[in-house]
Amino acid sequence: MLQPQIKLNAKNEIYVPGDKSISHRTVLFCALSQGKSEIHGFLEGEDPLHTLRCFESMGLSVSSLGKGSYSVVSPGKQNLNSPKGVLDFGNAGTGIRLSAGLLAGLPGMNATLTGDASLCKRPMARIMNPLQEMGASVISVEGNDRAPLRIEGKQLKDYSYVSPIASAQIKSALVLAALASDISIEYKESEVSRDHTENMIRFLGGTITHHSSVHFTVKPPYHFEGTKYVIPGDISSAAFFIVFGLCVGGSEPLLIKNIGLNPSRIGILTVLQNMGGKIEIIAKRVECGEEIGDLLVYPSKLKRTVITEDLIPSIIDEIPILTIAGLFSEGGFQISHAEELRAKESDRIRSMVSNLERLGVKVKEVNDGYEFDEVGTIQNAKIETFMDHRIAMSFAILSKLSGVSLSFDDTSWVDTSFPGFFEILKSV
């Protein structure tokens, strides 16, 4: 296994930016609510800012209250305007899919949703098909089940759906469509996916009836009023420094403060602890319906572990950085049941395998994942990021830990989710 070439600096306490998933959803729930809301801890990365700007063009009044803080006034969902131009979501898959659901349920809304070249390659049929079954008019402009999407808002009908995959984006798109159209929705999935949307509904006074952990119903009335949102740090962003803190040399812990610990998102902690990582959760609390805490991460000897299928939905965004942990693990690393990785910002299975091979790692790629045996050395290489922020950050962590010189074709994608990443990496 690889050996770390650095130890922590004296400064062993960091904060990471606000949760990306919650930041997107906060904008959408501000739009659905009547009146003034305040948002604190908003991720000022390109993805959530694109979503915020899109809804600003439809009638939200947005003013800055300082770094990561905004005042947002909504005329109410029934008074949102059709945008005059195309809604550009940049690289934000969450933004475009969830917004498509919400807008599809607003009668009289007319909008075209698009994004950058990477986003326009990502599959949209997974939300288009069930939305159309609800009575929505959502079509792919190019006829290829990809963005741009043209939406004509309709009054939708009550709907029951069994999702073929565990996807918080599909679930949230359909639930937001139901909230917009004041209808009931019954939803069932195969595994528990992240539930920030459900938490936000409850936080705003809505009722969700759970039939099981993967099966629920949401019914009107939905009367949401403006409120104050406080967004915790993103555990998907913290994951890069959790792995860094586990794999670094020495014995001093790294303290990562104010992290969202939603049970549907902490699979990363479970996997790393199963690999032998020592991670302590302190200062636990609940805010705006979300569990929060601070993480103490200790340098640890890691080993290969079996990552079970039920954990995949809760670690899908963290698999690239878990792979880096695998390079520092006894016995190597394996991931399977992760076909969904092929539909992310890049085909993350191919992206990770391609870059690992550039490092000289012998990797076996299969349709739903990849594996490699214990690694002793890696070589200098140029990393291709495939326009994917998590690929860029994962290999930047590897370069810092290993001391191996890695160059990158483009690291600007990091700003979509983690502005300030390289400054924090330099500071530790």
Curated annotation (Swiss-Prot):
Catalysed transformations (reactions): 3-phosphoshikimate + phosphoenolpyruvate = 5-O-(1-carboxyvinyl)-3-phosphoshikimate + phosphate
Enzyme Commission numbers on file: 2.5.1.19
InterPro entries: Enolpyruvate_Tfrase_dom, Enolpyruvate_Tfrase_sf, EPSP_synthase, EPSP_synthase_CS, RNA3'P_cycl/enolpyr_Trfase_a/b
First-listed, main subcellular location of the protein, grouped into a coarse class: cytoplasm
Annotated keywords: Amino-acid biosynthesis, Aromatic amino acid biosynthesis, Cytoplasm, Transferase
Binding site residues for 3-phosphoshikimate: K20, S21, R25, S167, Q169, D317, K344
Localization per record: Cytoplasm
Positions of phosphoenolpyruvate binding: K20, G93, R122, Q169, R348, R390
Top enzyme class: transferase
Pfam families: EPSP_synthase
Membrane is among the record's keywords: no
GO biological process, one term: amino acid biosynthetic process
GO cellular component: cytoplasm
GO molecular function, one term: 3-phosphoshikimate 1-carboxyvinyltransferase activity
Signal sequence, start to end: none
Pathway field: Metabolic intermediate biosynthesis; chorismate biosynthesis; chorismate from D-erythrose 4-phosphate and phosphoenolpyruvate: step 6/7
Active site, per annotation: D317 (proton acceptor)
Superkingdom of the source species: Bacteria
Disulfide bonds: none
PROSITE patterns: EPSP_SYNTHASE_2
Record text on subunit structure and interactions: Monomer.
Assigned protein family: Belongs to the EPSP synthase family.
Summary of the function given for this chain in its UniProt record: Catalyzes the transfer of the enolpyruvyl moiety of phosphoenolpyruvate (PEP) to the 5-hydroxyl of shikimate-3-phosphate (S3P) to produce enolpyruvyl shikimate-3-phosphate and inorganic phosphate.
Protein name: 3-phosphoshikimate 1-carboxyvinyltransferase
Species whose genome carries this gene: Leptospira biflexa serovar Patoc (strain Patoc 1 / ATCC 23582 / Paris)
